[in-house]
Amino acid sequence: MEFKAFIEITRPHNCLLAGIVGVLGSIVAAGGLPELKTAILVFLVVFLGCAGGNTINDYFDYEIDKINRPERPLPRGAMSRKAALWYSVALFATGIVLAWFINIWDFLLAIVAYVTMFIYAWKLKPMPFIGNVVVASLTGATPLYGAIAVGEIGLAGTLALCAFLVNVAREVIKDIEDIEGDMAKGAKTLPILIGRKRAAYVGALFAILTVVASFLPIKAGIGLGYLAMLPVDAVILYSAFLILRSQDRETAHRAQILLKVSVFLAVVAFLIASLVR
């Protein structure tokens, strides 16, 4: 068993990004910096939830990762499945304890989110489109988690909607990327059921809906601060163009990575908008 596997299996860069998005959700909602204690707790609860979710996902995806992700800790033998299971439980438990010190609503939301992550990895992931929507909902809830911590919603509501829509697009495109391994496991993902091309249309549609939703703050009188979102919209539309042009594994990987980056860029754009309006 490799010690570094305990770090690697959590996908720390993803968890770091998620934690930052949670904190930025607080800032976007309040239009200013939250208390340091609140910011640290929000970051840790989101980070630990993401880490636990990635770990339990790898536990249940052991067989399919032998095909799609053979370099990951479990399929390459760097960590046992039993260790991964208990590690995920420890991560979730620590996050729930910390959430108690934020407020009751964030405590309850953390429990719901963590349980949803487990059920998703256990049962929902192979279900066509439903699994995609669940993951996107969890991602969309991340900035809302930070907003609830400061008792405000504000622009974080629109940010959460955009994060949800763009992540539906990303999850569908990821399924296009992983179609070979999913077929080998017998999963019934959207690309397997309706074909790569039609799935690409679905992914592109949600990407376009994200861009449309991103204009909502203008109606709230956000002013010139919205201009920061325009480059993000361009990245999202380019991702849609890529997947419509080609559905091969390499292109799908590139498109979904761009959409992943766009989530963080969108948070930064909304942050700028909330501070300069």
From Swiss-Prot:
Its EC number is 2.5.1.42. The keyword Thylakoid does not apply. InterPro entries: DGGGP_synth, Prenyltransferase_related, UbiA_prenyltransferase, UbiA_sf. It is found in: Cell membrane. It is a multi-pass membrane protein. Its cofactor is Mg(2+). GO terms for biological process: glycerophospholipid biosynthetic process. The chain crosses the membrane at residues 16-36, 40-60, 83-105, 107-124, 146-166, 202-222, 224-244, 256-276. It catalyses: sn-3-O-(geranylgeranyl)glycerol 1-phosphate + (2E,6E,10E)-geranylgeranyl diphosphate = 2,3-bis-O-(geranylgeranyl)-sn-glycerol 1-phosphate + diphosphate. GO terms for cellular component: plasma membrane. The keyword Transferase applies. Its main location: membrane. Pfam families: UbiA. Prenyltransferase that catalyzes the transfer of the geranylgeranyl moiety of geranylgeranyl diphosphate (GGPP) to the C2 hydroxyl of (S)-3-O-geranylgeranylglyceryl phosphate (GGGP). This reaction is the second ether-bond-formation step in the biosynthesis of archaeal membrane lipids. Belongs to the UbiA prenyltransferase family. DGGGP synthase subfamily. HAMAP family: DGGGP_synth. This is Digeranylgeranylglyceryl phosphate synthase. It comes from Thermococcus kodakarensis (strain ATCC BAA-918 / JCM 12380 / KOD1).
